[in-house]
Amino acid sequence: MGKYNLILSEYLSFIYNSQSAVQIPIYYSSNSELENRCIEFHSKCLENSKNGLPLKKLFVEYSDVIENATLLSILSYSYDKYNAVERKLVKYAKGKPLEADLTVNELDYENNKITSELFPTAEEYTDSLMDPAILTSLSSNLNAVMFWLEKHENDAAEKLKIYKRRLDLFTIVASTVNKYGVPRHNEKYRYEYEVMKDKPYYLVTWANSSIEMLMSVFSHEDYLIARELIVLSYSNRSTLAKLVSSPMSILVALVDINGTFITNEELELEFSNKYVRAIVPDQTFDELKQMLDNMRKAGLTDIPKMIQDWLADCSIEKFPLMAKIYSWSFHVGFRKQKMLDAALDQLKTEYTEDIDDEMYREYTMLIRDEVVKMLKEPVKHDDHLLQDSELAGLLSMSSASNGESRQLKFGRKTIFSTKKNMHVMDDMANGRYTPGIIPPVNVDKPIPLGRRDVPGRRTRIIFILPYEYFIAQHAVVEKMLIYAKHTREYAEFYSQSNQLLSYGDVTRFLSNNSMVLYTDVSQWDSSQHNTQPFRKGIIMGLDMLANMTNDARVIQTLNLYKQTQINLMDSYVQIPDGDVIKKIQYGAVASGEKQTKAANSIANLALIKTVLSRISNKYSFATKIIRVDGDDNYAVLQFNTEVTKQMVQDVSNDVRETYARMNAKVKALVSTVGIEIAKRYIAGGKIFFRAGINLLNNEKRGQSTQWDQAAVLYSNYIVNRLRGFETDREFILTKIMQMTSVAITGSLRLFPSERVLTTNSTFKVFDSEDFIIEYGTTDDEVYIQRAFMSLSSQKSGIADEIAASSTFKNYVSRLSEQLLFSKNNIVSKGIALTEKAKLNSYAPISLEKRRAQISALLTMLQKPVTFKSSKITINDILRDIKPFFTVSEAHLPIQYQKFMPTLPDNVQYIIQCIGSRTYQIEDDGSKSAISRLISKYSVYKPSIEELYKVISLHENEIQLYLISLGIPKIDADTYVGSKIYSQDKYRILESYVYNLLSINYGCYQLFDFNSPDLEKLIRIPFKGKIPAVTFILHLYAKLEVINHAIKNGSWISLFCNYPKSEMIKLWKKMWNITSLRSPYTNANFFQD
């Protein structure tokens, strides 16, 4: 097996380098004779080490085990005291420690002062402004770097340069940390006052960021960027990232387009060799110069110089360096402010009387009309979702905080919890559940706040509203989103599109007589001026809608929604400030409502339309596209004449002046060739993404385990890598080793092997080969997968007790009764399971499950339990298929231009050969006829797993399932008796398999799986008519071909001769595939 086990063994001898340390490898095998040898080998190793005898002889004696069995884990003993980090660090602490400049940041606590200066006593201390919020420690991070450095000190040539660059940067970190001593973390990986009081407050988070940056250094340019950011971020904890990334919004406007990809009528990307010149007025260069000056004022030298040098010829070839700077700037870590400052920030905007009422009127009307347009059809037709909005809300209620901790009784158990789902159950049990009354959020009941931290931006506050707000808004917002799904203007929601489609949309209309206007409206969304017109527009829309129906329940839904808007127009928030809780009248819009995303998109669309209608009084142009994407909006305007510098400048100034008339503090820019928005930027006709995901600092703490976080770390590393920011893979693997190790006692630790962590099981954390998802098909792989499946789900006593209480049971049966027209076990069980799963966010339950999981894992890692499972996984299917394929060499020419320059070479090569896709493959079954039928009559949304289970039942059972969900008998009969039903079987199976194979994640989401170039490498003679089997054979072949190409940069072709007799067997098996959830799949999902 691969590199991981090798590094693991080297890492262990690096960490435990004393005489007393022992490493015992544990092997397993699916072959019973060899397995017995494995067991013998293990017990002899234990015996020898207990008696202080060396293990070398055993390794020779049991060479058959070492050569033929699979490494399961490594057991490591060490009686060493744990000051090893400090000892090793001294060797590297040869430089001059950094001194923080304590005047850089406006807010006193953002300066990197000694902790006791910021917080004189332990009572005042909080780690919330510098908490790395990750389940790994600074000492582990230092160890991982020192391990890498020691391993590579004898590198040669180019590798030696990388070593020297990193060593130089680590010297800065080591010297600074060593000056104060390595802060020791507690068992929750937090840094307490006693540890921090004599050290700079931001030392830990700074060191983590710096380590992340220095381990991402390869070239000399990387080194210069990293050095500057590491040194300056030690002092500047507030504006550094913003300063460094600001110029990008202008840089994208400077590069000529010479050939680009555009979206064609079929929504595919096609190459266009058009040439568009960048028209840049002097004013733009002045603004850029100002930005570079601001950077220099802040002490930056190398980075502004790189940008200055690039400006000489503004070439797309050298643009990736600009992209790199832009990505690196985020890796200085999160800016975490006090809640009070975050809230006051939005309240400081001056209110002027001098605004254009006419524009505000137009803005409000546009919001009103859009709300009406979105909801008109469902309201007129008395849509059942709007009738049963309360039930729909309850079914999709989250288990997030409800804003206050309450004492709740479940049977004989009394617990304290803040979770929404538990509050709802408790309220129902005690007759306090009144969804028809939306509680006020005024001065008597101010809103508690959550927070959102982002690198390079101020902290934003989030409303934690009572659950009644969610129930009132859910159904209506869902209907708005359905409308947005087939409206191109809403880039974020547009049906199954991905970022590449939006890219082709912009470049489509760029030409010498058009310009693109792009605006960052994030300031506007949270500004006070927006709130009244915004809420009023929505209210007016709801009033108009209420007149379009006579259905009392629909009117009630609209009225409750309206009430949430009315209440929020008079909102107060509560902010803890020291001991007191301050109540502040908060007149701005904040995130936290269900409608946040949808409503902001509506408002931003209304805003750009208002501005454009003003501009059109002065210029004559055609609006080719208008798009809104989150906090950004953009539009392409086509004029009758060629665009000149003067025109760009005039339009730009007029647009800004128009925004100013609404007192909207937004950043509006006009360009002829590119745009920059939060999600992506287009320069020189190519698309770029910011690779700004922090690896060693997290935004907030959740209830995920170390394993989960190791998987998230790997997943973040992959996303960054696809976007052009590469961190040393060995370092990432070292972090995974540290984070997945399990302590047995103080001196005894167990480290799982690569096989355990990469096999597609409930414990999967990473892929042995980046970008390639392998599904093991060897005996040992399937054996271990089976073993892990035997201990997959852990029980929790607390959860069982809650689930057995009448409060819980009554709640679940109440949901079932409201939803179902007749008995339906599948749905009832499903609801109960979903509700029980929501309990996991209650800490004591997740802790209990974690402990059980770990003890089961410990047993398993020392000796896998043989477990004959009847469950079939996707691995079994692929294992059956594999033998019937024969491989031969093939050749595919490169035939597409690059349009995503930051991709790693091996991924880029595949796109250049087979092309890319601009759509998401449907993997949730929502396009199937049965799913549409259910959503036509019921608010219940079955998961892909449930659809997969239901569609394979007997026809009469499917009928009963449908009828119980309120589908009229005639419709259910028609469905089962029609061709559509057999098409559905195939379609749902297809969706389910796509889902299992994570086809929309990682780099697979970039490839065109239906590429004719790919198809011609695969030959499968057509036998018998089982489309499902043909599908899986083709998909397997495509994945094999693509994986081979990623790994080797060359193509193979596959021929399959699948016997007819086997087909029916395989088809039967395909209806019993179990899906596996793992930290790895969670991390993928988390990216979404």
Curated annotation (Swiss-Prot):
Q: Which residues form the RdRp catalytic domain?
A: 501-687
**Which reaction does this chain catalyze?**
RNA(n) + a ribonucleoside 5'-triphosphate = RNA(n+1) + diphosphate
Against PROSITE patterns, the record matches this protein to: RDRP_DSRNA_REO (PS50523)
What is the uppermost EC class here?
transferase
Q: Which parts of the chain span the membrane according to its record?
A: none
Compartments where found: Virion
**Is-annotated flag, keyword Nucleotide-binding?**
yes
Q: Name one GO molecular function term.
A: RNA binding
Q: Pfam families, alphabetically? A: RdRP_4 (PF02123), Rotavirus_VP1 (PF12289)
Tell me which GO cellular component terms the UniProt record holds: virion component
Keywords for this protein: Magnesium, Nucleotide-binding, Nucleotidyltransferase, RNA-binding, RNA-directed RNA polymerase, Transferase, Viral RNA replication, Virion
Function recorded in the entry: RNA-directed RNA polymerase that is involved in both transcription and genome replication. Together with VP3 capping enzyme, forms an enzyme complex positioned near the channels situated at each of the five-fold vertices of the core. Following infection, the outermost layer of the virus is lost, leaving a double-layered particle (DLP) made up of the core and VP6 shell. VP1 then catalyzes the transcription of fully conservative plus-strand genomic RNAs that are extruded through the DLP's channels into the cytoplasm where they function as mRNAs for translation of viral proteins.
Assembly, per entry: Interacts with VP3 (Potential). Interacts with VP2; this interaction activates VP1. Interacts with NSP5; this interaction is probably necessary for the formation of functional virus factories. Interacts with NSP2; this interaction is weak.
Q: What family does this chain come from, according to its entry?
A: Belongs to the reoviridae RNA-directed RNA polymerase family.
Q: What's this protein's name?
A: RNA-directed RNA polymerase
